[in-house]
Every structure is written in structure tokens, then in C-alpha cells.
């Protein structure tokens, strides 16, 4: 056996694998909110940040299985300004901010859960996706948002659509109604991102039934697999080279 040739081949193969991994598209996963200001409160009193972190970690696993590189932002729950979140994701090829949804205050009702009065609204359910036309890559942002929405619908999830309602606090026009994509031009994390960017509202946690579904590990896995499929396909379609 030619040992030198074998070693040389091994080194070359390792270098090729390293180069392939480095060429894989990267996704910055922004975990919405932080411990001191955890976002919306669910119908049963759970803070949005905990939903966001659990789902983002599941999405990270799915993206890695799909061959993508990832960067988590905000996983430790420390406060990060909105503009700084976008700055932290500047090295990535795509920026995805993970959230869970509520409703406008006038839609909230009160019920008792575990001996405490809690706000809820069963009026709306479903996911929403947002893009900004002030992002430096609005076309790519919309293309990937549409791909995400389509993949989520194929997985059995439905868009909420209510963010387009002509009421105070909403009126976010559709960018792609069928796939639940809205324009939200002034959203800081979207317009400040250096790469194509989407904000993903996975579901409405003030809806009592949807909260229970979103809290299930199986649901998180289904969402994550759909997100990885949609985003992976979008990045491929953009011509980004990725090791398969």
C-alpha cells in the first residue's frame, strides 16, 4: 500500500468536506424577545419567549439535518436591542426571527385557569410571515417567505390572515395571501438585516386550543421540518451552493 498516497487522499477528502461545509448557506435564527420582556402571554399564562426558544432550537436541528449552517441569536434570554439582533446576524445568508402571536387587546376576553384570571382569544389561529420592502433584498425575502408558507401549508398548517384586517394595529398588506405573507416595512429586525429576512409567527398562543397544540413536541417538530424544507429549497433556488 502506498501510505503517502493514502494519507494525501485522506487530507484532500477532509479539505473538500471542510470546504463543502463552509460553502453551505447559513441561517441566523433570532429567538424573539428575552427573559425580562418575554413578549405575549399565552391563554394559560406561559410566556412567549419560552415558546420561541423551544421552537427555534427545533428549527436549528432541522436546518442542520438539511445541510444548512445555523447561528442562534438570543438563546440565553439576555436583552438584545432589535437593531443589534440584525447586526449579530450579518454574517448569515438568511435571517429568520421566530415568534408566537397574540391579538389586538380589544379582542381579548378573560377566563379562569389554575385559579387565576387569564386573557385569551379564540378568534384567530394560524401562522403568519412578514417581510420588509426596506430590507436590502426584498425580492429574496419574499421568495423565501412564500416558500416557508407553502411548506407549512403542505405540512397541514394554515395561515391566520388577520394581520391584513383594516383595523388599528394591523393593516399589514398581503405580499402573498395564499401563503400567509404580509408586508411589515418598518419592522426593525427585518429592515435592518443585511441579508434576506423573514419574521415568522408560528401560531396564536392566546387561542386556548392552539396554545395546547403549539406546546406539543410533535407540533414543533412538524413546523421545524417544514421550515427547513421551505428555506432549504429557497436557498437552493437562489443558486447558493450547498453540500448535499
What are these regions (language model features)?
Residues 9-10, 22, 35, 42, ...:
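Generic hydrophobic-segment detector
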Residues 19-25:
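Boundary at the C-terminal end of the N-terminal hydrophobic targeting segment
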Residues 25-45:
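Short glycine-rich His-centered loop
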Residues 1-5:
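Positively charged n-region of N-terminal signal peptides that target proteins for export
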Residues 50-244:
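Active-site-proximal helix/loop segments of hydrolytic enzymes
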Residues 8-18:
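Bacterial N-terminal signal peptides
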Amino acid at each position: 500500500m502506498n501510505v503517502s498516497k493514502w494519507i494525501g487522499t485522506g487530507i484532500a477528502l477532509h479539505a473538500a468536506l471542510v470546504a463543502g461545509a463552509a460553502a453551505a448557506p447559513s441561517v441566523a435564527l433570532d429567538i424573539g424577545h428575552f427573559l425580562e420582556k418575554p413578549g405575549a402571554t399565552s391563554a394559560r399564562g406561559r410566556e412567549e419567549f419560552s415558546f420561541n426558544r423551544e421552537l427555534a432550537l427545533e428549527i436549528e436541528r432541522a436546518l442542520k439535518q438539511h445541510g444548512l449552517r445555523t447561528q442562534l441569536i438570543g438563546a440565553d434570554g439576555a436583552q438584545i436591542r432589535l437593531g443589534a439582533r440584525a447586526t449579530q446576524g450579518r454574517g448569515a445568508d438568511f435571517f429568520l426571527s421566530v415568534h408566537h402571536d397574540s391579538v389586538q387587546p380589544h379582542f381579548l376576553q378573560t377566563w379562569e385557569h389554575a385559579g387565576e384570571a387569564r386573557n385569551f382569544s379564540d378568534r384567530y389561529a394560524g401562522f403568519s410571515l412578514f417581510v420588509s420592502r426596506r430590507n436590502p433584498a426584498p425580492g429574496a425575502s419574499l421568495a423565501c417567505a412564500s416558500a416557508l408558507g407553502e411548506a407549512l401549508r403542505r405540512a397541514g398548517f394554515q395561515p391566520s390572515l388577520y394581520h391584513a384586517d383594516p383595523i388599528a394595529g394591523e393593516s399589514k398588506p398581503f405580499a402573498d395571501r395564499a401563503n400567509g405573507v404580509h408586508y411589515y416595512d418598518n419592522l426593525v429586525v427585518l429592515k435592518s438585516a443585511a441579508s434576506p429576512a423573514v419574521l415568522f409567527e408560528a401560531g396564536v398562543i392566546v387561542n386556548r386550543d392552539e396554545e395546547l397544540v403549539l406546546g406539543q413536541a410533535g407540533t414543533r417538530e412538524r413546523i421545524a421540518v417544514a421550515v427547513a424544507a421551505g428555506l432549504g429549497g429557497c436557498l437552493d433556488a437562489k443558486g447558493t451552493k450547498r453540500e448535499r
